[in-house]
UniProtKB/Swiss-Prot annotation:
This is Ribosome association toxin RatA. It comes from Escherichia coli (strain K12). InterPro entries: COQ10-like, COQ10_START, START-like_dom_sf. Associates with 50S ribosomes. The keyword Glycoprotein does not apply. One of its GO terms (biological process) is cellular respiration. Disruption phenotype: Deletion of the ratA-ratB operon has no effect on bacterial persistence on rich medium for this strain, but does affect bacterial persistence for E.coli strain CFT073. It comes from the Bacteria. CDD domains: COQ10p_like. Toxic component of a type II toxin-antitoxin (TA) system. Binds to 50S ribosomal subunits, preventing them from associating with 30S subunits to form 70S ribosomes and reducing polysomes. It does not cause ribosomes to dissociate however. The antibiotic paromomycin blocks the anti-association activity of RatA. Overexpression results in inhibition of growth in liquid cultures, and in a decrease in protein translation. The other gene of this operon, ratB, is not the cognate antitoxin in this strain; in CFT073 however it does fulfill this function. Low level expression in a deletion mutant increases resistance to acidified sodium nitrate which causes nitrosative stress. Belongs to the ribosome association toxin RatA family. GO terms for molecular function: ribosomal large subunit binding; ubiquinone binding.
Length: 158
């Protein structure tokens, strides 16, 4: 029973966000949009800056600046890249005790795919969670929609 209660408490403390969408764009197109970290400030709500710190063909370390309602934070992730298939993110630095997640791109045809976004996170302390938690959850929950809108802007113009 204690383990079960502990598990329930752990689930409450560590929020999870999962979103899925079917889009009329290829897995390659969606992967390229999500992997284009430097373009995030142009279209991601709340993203005020982004930069690639290190990059190799299979891995990228990137920092993202987020600001909303007067609250600003920067976090850095190391992303494992599987070209046109997935991007797995792990926390390097930021206001989190834990931040892991990623994107999966599943082809449905040559011109359509399913995108999946999942994020597990826990803030370093309650004060940061109170100040930034709601803002971060809102931004993370809207990421799939933001990338879907971006895909329409970028790929429908071609």
């Amino acid at each position: 029973m204690i383990l079960f209660v502990g598990f329930l408490l752990m689930e409450i403390v560590m929020p999870q966000i999962s979103r899925t969408a079917l889009v009329p764009y290829s897995a390659e197109q969606m992967y390229q949009l999500v992997n284009d970290v430097q373009s995030y400030p142009q279209f991601l709500p709340g993203c005020t800056g982004s930069r690639i710190l290190e990059s190799t063909p299979g891995q990228m370390t990137a920092a993202v600046d987020v600001s909303k309602a007067g609250i600003s934070k920067t976090f850095t992730t190391r992303n494992q890249l599987t070209s046109n298939q997935s991007i797995l993110m792990n926390l390097v630095d930021g206001p989190f005790k834990k931040l892991i997640g990623g994107w999966k791109f599943t082809p449905l045809s040559q011109e359509a795919c399913r995108i999946e976004f999942h994020l597990d996170f826990e803030f370093t302390n309650k004060l940061i969670e109170l100040a930034f938690g709601r803002v971060f959850k809102e931004l993370a929950a809207n990421m799939v929609q933001a990338f879907t809108v971006r895909a329409k802007e970028v790929y429908s113009a071609r």
